[in-house]
Design a protein with these regions (language model features):
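Short Gly/Pro-enriched turn/cap motifs at secondary-structure boundaries
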Residues: 31-36
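Immediate flanking context of iron-sulfur cluster ligation sites
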Residues: 51-61
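Alpha-helical support elements that line or immediately flank enzyme active sites
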Residues: 65-80
Length: 127
């Protein structure tokens, strides 16, 4: 299976790897996993007073496609509001990275992670 140059780039040079303080009220955390393939993804967002995502971090244990999907997603969500971020579809990620059909589940994981992070943030804020 051949990976696209974008997958290889995000895998070899992942963007926004790290962790934000989960106790911070401005941080939403999404933790998702796919036991079938062993991929686990933690994605976090920091939201400003204006409701715009200021920062995003991830840590992914999994294959190159899972790492690339979460790396790309952290780039995409910065500067977006919560609704825009939660509206990102796995198909957009898969298309951007040219993921092969057997790796589509990695983009689904990334979509689930951003939705979970947005929900966690909103739950903290009581919104």
């Amino acid at each position: 299976m051949a990976y696209s140059e974008k997958v290889i780039d995000h895998y070899e040079n992942p963007r926004n790897v790290g962790k934000l303080d989960e106790a911070d009220d401005s941080v939403g955390t999404g933790m998702v996993g796919a036991p079938a393939c062993g991929d686990v993804m933690r994605l976090q967002i920091r939201v400003g007073e204006d409701g715009i995502i200021e920062d995003a971090k991830f840590k992914t244990y999994g294959c190159g496609s899972a790492i690339a999907s979460s790396s790309l997603l952290t780039e995409w969500v910065k500067g977006k509001n919560l609704d825009e971020a939660a509206a990102i579809k796995n198909t957009e990620i898969a298309q951007e990275l040219s993921l092969p059909p057997v790796k589509i589940h990695c983009s689904v994981l990334a979509e689930d992670a951003i939705k979970a992070a947005v929900k966690n943030y909103r739950d903290k804020k009581g919104a």
